[in-house]
């Protein structure tokens, strides 16, 4: 193992993966970082192989996907693995963010770590949207048309920006070429951000369920936490294999198996499932510009968490029953937003979406600051009582 400490490149690997000291009390919720790294590697590899056979042309894109499925050796495995790992990627990052919110991992000194993570989430959504357009089925075409048209809400320059993205006056060959180029290159930018995320993590070390910084009770990453990560990695491969080989279209949309036809509008136009909560927020506001701002704001609002949580304690929210109740409501509300986004924009889903959107933003702007101030007040009262006793 001496080479890991003397070689310039391997010393970096040793510092971050092998000898990195980790808190002894990390639970399995801390395993999602390694699962996300694995998903990114799988996506880049399968994406590179798929790009060898894909043709970014409006007349040939759909047929090239069918060629991959039917004629390329194990092409169907490549395509279904790429599509389903994308879904798992978002499942894992939502749990990863939820864990950060639950345990206060966004608190100083890890503000930079949290901020990079939010940027990664936004970039992932952009990459996912670009990839959804590439098969050029019905949902791809109309999804691209609707989502890119949102930019027309920008005053004065909106329509010009939309036409610049399209490369014309509608989704066309130029659009598909641009989306393919960006979908190919942006995952490498995502990988660079993931490395920056790791560097920021290594600077102050990983958080832990108690929220306490302790340099004494730590173990090396290898072998303890490496083998712990392998448990969830093997479980992930088991579930992924079952879905890829038995239920490959479980998280897909049937309309995307119909070639794109600009003359026929699908009965419902919905994005991929992992974008549905934010799509519901967009639809819940009648004004187009305000809806677009709310949708992007619902992502970027995560950046303010380190500044609106005034609590003097950190760690598990079970230490504060009030926070625990409101966080549970927030999670249920987020899931409800996803269900609302999957349904048509009719009553009662319009009203339900507006209520859920209000709760979503209220959690960050009202609930977190108020509950943290209440917690500090109760702690001060308890301290005064203990001193006077």
Curated annotation (Swiss-Prot):
Binding site for a ubiquinone: 202
GO CC annotation terms, alphabetical: mitochondrial inner membrane; respiratory chain complex III
Sorted UniProt keywords: Electron transport, Heme, Iron, Membrane, Metal-binding, Mitochondrion, Mitochondrion inner membrane, Respiratory chain, Transmembrane, Transmembrane helix, Transport, Ubiquinone
Annotated residues for binding of heme b b562: 82, 183
Keyword Calcium (UniProt): no
Membrane topology, from the record: Multi-pass membrane protein
SUPFAM superfamilies to which the protein is assigned, alphabetical: a domain/subunit of cytochrome bc1 complex (Ubiquinol-cytochrome c reductase), Transmembrane di-heme cytochromes
One GO process term, biological-process aspect: mitochondrial electron transport, ubiquinol to cytochrome c
Quaternary state and interactors: Fungal cytochrome b-c1 complex contains 10 subunits; 3 respiratory subunits, 2 core proteins and 5 low-molecular weight proteins. Cytochrome b-c1 complex is a homodimer.
Family: Belongs to the cytochrome b family.
Extra information: Heme 1 (or BL or b562) is low-potential and absorbs at about 562 nm, and heme 2 (or BH or b566) is high-potential and absorbs at about 566 nm.
Protein name: Cytochrome b
The species this protein was found in: Mycena viridimarginata
């Amino acid at each position: 193992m001496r080479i890991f400490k003397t070689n310039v490149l391997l010393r970096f690997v040793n510092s971050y993966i092998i000898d990195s000291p980790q808190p002894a009390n990390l639970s399995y919720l801390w395993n999602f970082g390694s699962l996300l790294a694995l998903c990114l590697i799988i996506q880049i590899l399968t994406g590179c192989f798929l790009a060898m056979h894909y043709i970014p042309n409006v007349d040939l894109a759909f047929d090239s996907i069918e060629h991959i499925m039917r004629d390329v050796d194990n092409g169907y495995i490549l395509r279904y693995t790429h599509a389903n790992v994308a879904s798992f990627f978002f499942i894992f990052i939502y749990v990863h963010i939820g864990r950060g919110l639950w345990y206060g991992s966004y608190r100083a000194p890890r503000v930079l770590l949290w901020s990079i993570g939010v940027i990664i989430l936004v970039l992932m959504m952009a990459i996912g949207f670009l990839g959804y357009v590439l098969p050029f089925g019905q949902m791809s075409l109309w999804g691209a048309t609707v989502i890119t048209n949102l930019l027309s809400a920008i005053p004065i320059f909106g329509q010009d920006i939309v036409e610049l993205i399209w490369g014309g006056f509608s989704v066309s060959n130029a659009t598909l070429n641009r989306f393919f180029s960006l979908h190919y290159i942006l995952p490498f930018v995502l990988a660079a951000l993931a490395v920056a995320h790791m560097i920021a993590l290594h600077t102050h070390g990983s958080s832990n369920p108690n929220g306490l910084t302790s340099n004494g009770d730590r173990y090396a990453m290898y072998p303890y936490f490496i083998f712990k990560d392998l448990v969830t990695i093997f479980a992930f491969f088991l579930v992924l294999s079952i879905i890829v080989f038995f239920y490959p279209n479980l998280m897909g949309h049937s309309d995307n198996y119909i070639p794109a036809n600009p003359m026929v509008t699908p009965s419902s136009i919905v994005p991929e499932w992992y974008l549905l909560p934010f799509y519901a927020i967009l639809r819940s506001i009648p004004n187009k510009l305000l809806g677009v701002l709310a949708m992007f704001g619902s992502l970027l609002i995560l950046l303010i968490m380190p500044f609106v949580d005034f609590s003097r304690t950190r760690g598990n929210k079970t230490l504060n029953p009030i926070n625990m109740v409101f966080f549970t409501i927030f999670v249920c509300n987020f899931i409800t937003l996803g269900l609302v986004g999957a349904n048509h924009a009719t009553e009662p889903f319009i009203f339900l979406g507006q209520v859920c959107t209000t709760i979503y933003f209220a959690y960050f702007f009202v609930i977190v600051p108020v509950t943290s101030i209440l917690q500090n007040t109760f702690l001060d009262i308890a301290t005064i009582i203990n001193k006077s006793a």
